[in-house]
């Protein structure tokens, strides 16, 4: 993607994620004037781009009592599902624990959309290549 394209991608995901948070707060009756500042929406977009670019790349995660390696599409996909579940649960109350779930969801969705515009050629890493042996 390159440095400049990555910066623009990151900032666009962040701005669009913040707009998702503001609009969802207004739509669902929460106070839209509560300030929200953070990079989590932009990072959500980066996670989506990583999942699209390297779906089978192994990610190290802590599960129960040990570290294991799972494919990126599974780890990031489950993270996104948890954001949707927690975001839906936060709609029922006045507080979401200070977490802007709509920004996470919006940043992820916009990351999925924007990565197609910003990446011209997908680089296949050696560990992602299939072997006949």
Give the residues covered by each predicted segment.
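A detector for small-residue-rich transmembrane helices and their helix-helix packing motifs
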Residues: 1-133
């Amino acid at each position: 993607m390159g440095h400049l394209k990555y910066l623009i991608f990151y900032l666009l995901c962040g701005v669009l994620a913040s707009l998702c948070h503001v609009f969802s707060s207004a739509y669902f009756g929460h106070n839209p004037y509560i300030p929200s500042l953070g990079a989590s929406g932009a990072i959500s977009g980066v996670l989506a781009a990583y999942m699209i670019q390297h779906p089978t790349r192994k990610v190290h995660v802590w599960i129960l009592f040990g570290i294991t390696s799972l494919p990126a599409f599974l780890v990031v996909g489950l993270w996104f599902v948890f954001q949707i579940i927690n975001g839906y649960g936060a709609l029922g109350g006045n507080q979401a624990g200070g977490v802007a779930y709509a920004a996470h969801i919006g940043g992820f969705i916009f990351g999925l959309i924007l990565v197609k515009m910003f990446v011209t050629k997908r680089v296949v890493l050696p560990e992602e290549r299939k072997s006949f042996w």
